[in-house]
Amino acid sequence: MNAAEIMRSYIIDIETYSIAEQAGMFCESLKENQDGSLFKDTKFCYYEDEPYEVSFIWDRDELRIQLTFKGDPDDSTWLIINGKRRFRGQIKDIEKSCRTFLDTLKEMTVS
């Protein structure tokens, strides 16, 4: 199962509309743009504290990939940690945010 399919399986059960909408749009963008190898061999974890936030988390060794969607869309973020390197971005313009997220993930997993 790829990252977008995993997200989709959880989004269906999110009750807070604004969170489900954000996560759903990001999931669609991820589905269109992702390289499946970026999430290869990761362990998935889902966290929810509705109606405030939900997080999708993937871990592999020192790599942590996290998407957090909050009730207030201005507070939603993506986070990538690899060892001592840490990058975080806001999820505003879904398409642009997703591309930036994936580009950063590629850069951090290659180097």
Question: Where are the predicted features?
Answer:
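Exposed alpha-helical structural elements
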Residues: 22, 97-100
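Membrane-insertive, pore-forming/entry segments and their flanking low-complexity regions
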Residues: 88-91, 100, 109-111
